[in-house]
Amino acid sequence: EAGEECDCGSPENPCCDAATCKLRPGAQCADGLCCDQCRFMKKGTVCRVAKGDWNDDTCTGQSADCPRNGLYG
């Protein structure tokens, strides 16, 4: 929603302040296939395995999202 940096549903989330819906100090992300321990995963980390001859999807190192490259099983 507007003004939110993260989903503030769970007070146990170490990356997101449940009271403000903002990332905690030092956190880059709170969830996503390319988010691990509140940090963006390294560029090239496989975040989704492809099906067949397509390439696996990999993290960009700049976002918690996993960009789609091909077909999946």
Swiss-Prot record:
CC annotations in GO: extracellular region; plasma membrane
Tissue specificity comment: Expressed by the venom gland.
UniProt KW keywords: Cell adhesion impairing toxin, Disulfide bond, Hemostasis impairing toxin, Pharmaceutical, Platelet aggregation inhibiting toxin, Secreted, Toxin
Disintegrin domain segment(s): 1-73
Subcellular localization: Secreted
Major localisation: secreted
Annotated motif Cell attachment site, positions: 51-53
Subunit structure: Monomer.
PANTHER family: ADAM A DISINTEGRIN AND METALLOPROTEASE DOMAIN, DISINTEGRIN AND METALLOPROTEINASE DOMAIN-CONTAINING PROTEIN 28
Note: The disintegrin belongs to the medium disintegrin subfamily.
Its biological purpose: Inhibitor of ligand binding to the integrins alpha-IIb/beta-3 (ITGA2B/ITGB3). Competition with fibrinogen for the RGD recognition sites on the alpha-IIb/beta-3 integrin results in the inhibition of platelet aggregation induced by ADP, thrombin, platelet-activating factor and collagen.
Name this polypeptide is given: Disintegrin barbourin
UniProt lineage: Eukaryota, Metazoa, Chordata, Craniata, Vertebrata
